[in-house]
Amino acid sequence: MMAKNNKTTEAKMSKKRAASEESDVEEDEDKLLSVDGLIDAEASESDEDDDEYESAVEEKESSSDKEAQDDSDDDSDAELNKLLAEEEGDEEEDYDSSEFSDDTTSLTDRLSGVKLQTIVDPNIYSKYADGSDRIIKPEINPVYDSDDSDAETQNTIGNIPLSAYDEMPHIGYDINGKRIMRPAKGSALDQLLDSIELPEGWTGLLDKNSGSSLNLTKEELELISKIQRNEQTDDSINPYEPLIDWFTRHEEVMPLTAVPEPKRRFVPSKNEAKRVMKIVRAIREGRIIPPKKLKEMKEKEKTENYQYDLWGDSTETNDHVMHLRAPKLPPPTNEESYNPPEEYLLSPEEKEAWENTEYSERERNFVPQKYSALRKVPGYGESIRERFERSLDLYLAPRVRKNKLNIDPNSLIPELPSPKDLRPFPIRCSTIYAGHKGKVRTLSIDPSGLWLATGSDDGTVRVWEILTGREVYRTTLIDDEENPDDHIECIEWNPDANNGILAVAVGENIHLIVPPIFGYDIENNGKTKIEDGFGYDTFGTVKKSNLEVNENGDGDEDGENESAKNAVKKQVAQWNKPSQKQLEKDICITISCKKTVKKLSWHRKGDYFVTVQPDSGNTSVLIHQVSKHLTQSPFKKSKGIIMDAKFHPFKPQLFVCSQRYVRIYDLSQQILVKKLLPGARWLSKIDIHPRGDNLIASSFDKRVLWHDLDLASTPYKTLRYHEKAVRSVNFHKKLPLFSSAADDGTIHVFHATVYDDMMKNPMIVPLKKLTGHKVINSLGVLDAIWHPREAWLFSAGADNTARLWTT
């Protein structure tokens, strides 16, 4: 046995020596050959993966060698003997091969026996804790289209916020239950620098897995920049790929296939016939119901099982074209309540009067009664009668359908410019001329625009300096003891600024005054012009009135009564020299008329002025000439009560305003030119636009009427905005403004643009409502007048004051 064991040990030793010699020979050959550049075609892994794979293979081989050694120790003697016999045979073969081997073999002969091992299975095997095999697969390299939404997160805290770990050194746990420690934070200075100079890819968010700031990678930043520049995000996509013309743009002449149509396309289909017959049988048997019949069945079922919804919304049906619905009954009022307020209950006297009234004349068919509870209310006894009368009304009374006009109210309002764009115009009261003891009925402004004259019921005429409000002149023209009923009705400056004549209408007299406020030259010119008329009779001239206006406009009466025309007429007014007492009051001349003079207006040249006496009949309108001391009555008879009269601004025309009409007369041709129909009940005053083609009129029935003389005789605009009678209307001589004053104590200022284009209508824009005068005894603003040049307005009121309104 010992010998046997020695043999086996020697055999093993020899085998080890042979293995070591072979390994040395292989190493030398590897050094000489250096086959590092040979790569297996099937191996596609990286160098690191190959190293890991080789280490794993070596571990596996070593483990298998150990297992083989353990098993060989336990083999039986027979197996050992068999192995020894095989080893001896191998040694003999090796000895024979080595003995006859030739050292001069070529390199190619040596490489021909070399075999390269290829990796077929890319998986790496390891052991689990229980000893079973564990496959470690290589890491997956994700491509662009891959999705990592289901990837496992490193931090497994779930929905717990990171703020729960603020006081702990860790931020969560991984999948193995180990703590994930909080990353180290820099100093306060580092944090400040990081907040000032933001790092590249900064988002301001925290990474839940690591607890550090979550920054964008270069690839993500590049992707965002490409999206901002509207560029292609995937480089693998070519936006300019060559066009594949699926359908040729050239029209082919010959067909692609010229196969003739088969016969089955012209023969009725048997399959379709079977399907149609199947449907027909189903309809006959009632298994298929046509839509029309099904609809009728549903309607019939609906009518049979109809249940009225008492609380449902009422559905309106479309009426016939000729059908008119009955008007709805008015809803009940408070007096029809079972518990009405006390003021709705009738007193015994009212109840007795209601019972004595005829049924058809009663305002209501019942007497309001009060009950403590609704259950105590009896039945209404007049219900049958009311229903019967309503049926009679619906049956006998005709009804007409009135179509409602769907008009937008805003479309009816004209588009007017803003008042801010139409300045200047008066907006405030700057001066109050106080001093009169009675109502200031009239006022007038000097042509130079420096002096304001006012006339009051206290019998005085005062002249004020406009800018300072100082009274510079005063004269008393009415003696209350002699003429208690007279008033200063009208006052008007001469339009010629070189004479300073002031005409004042006091009762039946007209005084021409030259106030001593202008200086010697102007005062002398005015007095000289008045005194020149006294010498008119001295030179033998005859006072004739050759002005007679034919109101009918006919030429038939021109040849009649020529002698009567040339004859001397009876004087309608008398020019009197002033007395010594009147000279002390600066009165230069007095014109005595028959009746009270209400209105006075100068001609633009300053030689003529017209007066109105409403109660004087056919001599209501008189035209006076200062240079000749001549008074003429242009009309044979009066048509209505004359309220006002004015000259045209530049034409020889006279505007005469009666209570209801405005007539325009041509003084040169002595005919009636036009008759205006304002439509008001009682006109009070008129004024003509400086251009002469428009006229405004005021009325006591609270209206202001604008007439365009180039259009119809009816008003172009009728303005109703005053609450009481309108006393005065005036145009500005230079600016596109006009005003209206009324007894409600207000003055309305308007912008009025008159265009040169005859196709354009005047534009009227309300600007300002001026309030300041007090209403006394239902009298407010009695007169108003504009400054000759500035946008200033003067007003006279019943509160004994005159006011200046400026911008």
From Swiss-Prot:
Primary role: Component of the NOP7 complex, which is required for maturation of the 25S and 5.8S ribosomal RNAs and formation of the 60S ribosome.
Species per Swiss-Prot/TrEMBL record: Saccharomyces cerevisiae (strain YJM789) (Baker's yeast)
Annotated compartments: Nucleus, Nucleolus; Nucleus, Nucleoplasm
WD repeats: 435-474, 483-523, 592-634, 637-675, 678-717, 721-760, 776-807
Similarity field: Belongs to the WD repeat BOP1/ERB1 family.
HAMAP family hit by this protein: BOP1 (MF_03027)
Modified residues (Phosphoserine): 23, 72, 76, 146, 149, 418
Crosslink (Glycyl lysine isopeptide (Lys-Gly) (interchain with G-Cter in ubiquitin)) position: 127
Gene Ontology BP term (one): maturation of 5.8S rRNA from tricistronic rRNA transcript (SSU-rRNA, 5.8S rRNA, LSU-rRNA)
UniProt name for this protein: Ribosome biogenesis protein ERB1
Compositional bias of kind Basic and acidic residues: 57-69
Biased segments, Acidic residues type: 21-30, 42-56, 86-102
Coiled coil start-end: none
Subunit structure: Component of the NOP7 complex, composed of ERB1, NOP7 and YTM1. The complex is held together by ERB1, which interacts with NOP7 via its N-terminal domain and with YTM1 via a high-affinity interaction between the seven-bladed beta-propeller domains of the 2 proteins. The NOP7 complex associates with the 66S pre-ribosome.
Gene: ERB1
High-level lineage: Eukaryota, Fungi, Dikarya, Ascomycota, Saccharomycotina
One Gene Ontology term of the molecular function aspect: ribonucleoprotein complex binding
